[in-house]
Amino acid sequence: MVKGKMFGNGVLYPIVGFASCVAFVYLSFGDLWINIHSDVRLSFVERNGTQFIVDGKPFYFNGWNSYWMMDQAVDESRKHRIRAILQAGAKMGLTVCRTWAFNDGDYNALQISPGRFNERVFRSLDYVIAEARRNGIRLMLCLVNNLQAYGGKTQYVKWAWDEGVGLSSSNDSFFYDPSTRRYFKNYVKTVLTRKNTITGVEYRDDPTIFAWELINEPRCITDKSGDTLQDWIEEMSAFVKSVDRNHLLTVGLEGFYGPKSPKRLTVNPEFWASDIGTDFIRNSKLSTIDFASVHIYPDHWTHNPDFEYKLKFVYKWMLSHIEDGDKELKKPIMFTEFGLSTENKDFTPAQRDRFMKVILEIMYKSAIKNRSGGGSLVWQFLVEGMEEFNDDFGIVPWQRPSTYNLFTEQSCRLAMVQGALPTQMNYLKKLCTRRK
């Protein structure tokens, strides 16, 4: 999501009660500061058909987005926020966090210009990865933004244009201009082969990284056929795999169906979604793409303000994509962003909790049935004092006990289905009561 730099009615859905199986533990900010051993052992996440696998066992996960971590780690006075949010996630039983591994030509830029990097910012990303490992959290790292926030494809096009080699000033030329493709490949190789100054491990050899994401929310509206974006995905995914054979890779799609999937077009939120140059099934079907990503933003995607309509859309949207994973793609489906805007008319936190509960319930049912819905990441978690990063989706989880409880319940339920990871054991003992 990231808007800027900081930037059928009456349908009821059955929700399985679980409060009796969970002991809710409230976190105060002061509780977050705990000692964690640095010798946490993590294994690479792999794929076996439609399931994620860790140490040979199915891995269904519960997680969150905190896109801002590298940016905040640059400033010593704000560095504590990274440790706080990662420790909070671990205490909630969460296992995966998605964040940005890019900042192109902007304030605190990682990539100052094509091929020029800020070592101070790179060390901040080193710190984020090292802290995630210490807390037993795996990171999903995104490599560029389709949006202008943190530079994105707009910055790559500007670089090529300023150097007199750009084919067009259109942002979409990022996908077809040989110069921007070359810039991006160089960036990708530099990041993947980076040796962490704290751990001494190259990123491509570090199991702390759950997966790479090519681009956040790609769209290419100048080519509605989808051919331009498809060609870019084919080239870039093959390139990533040539550099890093250890990690999983996804595109970063929102999940919209395109012209190659005519029978699925009615699942899209509105007609415009099939005309933005993306095609969920086509883009995700490549052999170099290990799993598919989907976002869930019914209030931003539809004009219908009715809350029950939004829940109905979420239900249909998620089940359609899980079915795609099971039958068409035969790959895991990861819901990498979901949120409900606080700017909606008549918004209440209770309404948002209900929205999230529907999503988490669908994911739980996917886990107990061994389906392709592999995990979900809420957008977004913050710590106190981050108002400038709070788009209309930000949540400080320990300030909302009901919201906090939803996620801890989900962690406990998933652990009961698949067993707890070694990195979760101590926290889950505190969160989850035993079934009688």
Model-derived regions: residue spans:
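Active-site mouth of glycoside hydrolases
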Residues: 33-332, 338-354, 358-363, 367-427, ...
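N-terminal signal-anchor transmembrane helix specifying type II single-pass membrane topology
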Residues: 2-33
